[in-house]
Amino acid sequence: MTIGLEPAVSSKTKDKMEQDLSPIADKSCKENRELAKSGKLIEAIENLLITEKQCRQAEDSPSTSKIAAEIIKLCYEAGRLDLVNEKLVLLSKRRGQLRPAIKAIVQESMVYVDQITDMKQKLELIDTLRTISDGKIFVENERARLTKTLSKIKEDEGDIASAAKILQDLQVETYGTMEKREKITFFIDQMRICMNNKDFIRAQLIGNKVNRKTLAEDENQDLKIDYFKQMIRYFSHSANYIEIARCYLSIYDTPSVEKDTPQLLQTLKYICIYVILSASSNEQSDLLNRVYEFKPLTDIQNYKDLLNQFKTLELIRWSTFFELNKPELDSQTVFKTEPNAWEDLRKRVIEHNIRVISTYYQKISTARLAELLDLSLDESEKFVSDLVSNKTIFAKIDRPAGIATFTTTNDPNKVLNAWANNITSLLDLVEKTNHLVQREFMLHKIN
């Protein structure tokens, strides 16, 4: 025989759990607000604390939250910020304090942070709120926002190191209740402050936390632009031009940018500039050909012509190229802020010319090579060596003979295998031809 056992809950405990003390809470708030207005703030707070205890012990979360928030509100409205800090700590540490009540007083106090003009009092309130919210998951979002505010204050004061230290340790990616958009905003701010503090490695690690699929959503277009601007700043530090071009390409593919013609064309200009500044590679060549086919490029014909010069297998004379493009390129930010931009562009022109020469020449004298490149013998040899090291071209330079060779030396085994394959193909063709001739003889009965 099975006997059903029910939890031993006393009627007194059950009644306590089911109590609704909202009428008592409302009445207490109203009466003690009037009492506080008459100048008896301390007495009003004591009365409210008694009511708060009654509601807390009855586990009436809404009423407890309302009373606790009312206490903080009365202290602030009376201009007693010292009492605000004191009662925040008191209420958060009361025995068996309900989570909703702690969350209510933290959220109520956060409203006052923006309203307080005295910086010392503001910092004291932020410090109190961060202390009582430390280690409490149910107010982790509020703590993160307070930390961000504190970091901004330090940044405005010029203390970049402290601002970065405060903000960079936030692990908002683990916050389950924080919205994706707010998380990305935190990541972007963390990246920015880390780069302001010259901590580019940490900025990269934070940037990798951002989910690109979330950025692609329509409601996050502004965040997508802000994020890639920070990534551009990061890659600019190491002059990684191809990655900068890819970042601008991501901005270019944003619907809000596509609708804004001036911004679209300016972004396209940046893409063109950074593509031609990028070192020669398969990725660079692919990107250059893709960008060249963009329809809006016809509205900025000089940039299309610029890409075409690097797309066409013809030599580019640096002096003519420089005079033709200097006025336009000097107006762009990269050539104003990046001291090595023109030198890097000159290197790209030289690399392009070497690739053109390697296409049309199997062998060329080093003197003629230097003449075509407008370089000295040593400079031309260095550039050729760099391209060979990068596996962009194949070349050998015979210094005593003064000859540069751009054709690869075939491996004897590969040559022998190719010859054997060709002979096999030839014999197969002879055999097939013989069969066809014999068939014609038979069809026409020719002996």
Curated annotation (Swiss-Prot):
Pfam families: PCI, PSMD12-CSN4_N, RPN5_C
Ranges for domain PCI: 240-411
UniProtKB keywords: Proteasome
Keyword Endoplasmic reticulum appears in the UniProt entry: no
InterPro entries: PCI_dom, PSMD12-CSN4-like_N, PSMD12/CSN4, RPN5_C, WH-like_DNA-bd_sf, WH_DNA-bd_sf
Gene3D superfamilies assigned to the protein according to its UniProt record, in alphabetical order: Winged helix-like DNA-binding domain superfamily/Winged helix DNA-binding domain
Family to which the UniProt record says this protein belongs: Belongs to the proteasome subunit p55 family.
Entry protein name: 26S proteasome non-ATPase regulatory subunit 12
Lineage start: Eukaryota, Amoebozoa, Evosea, Eumycetozoa, Dictyostelia
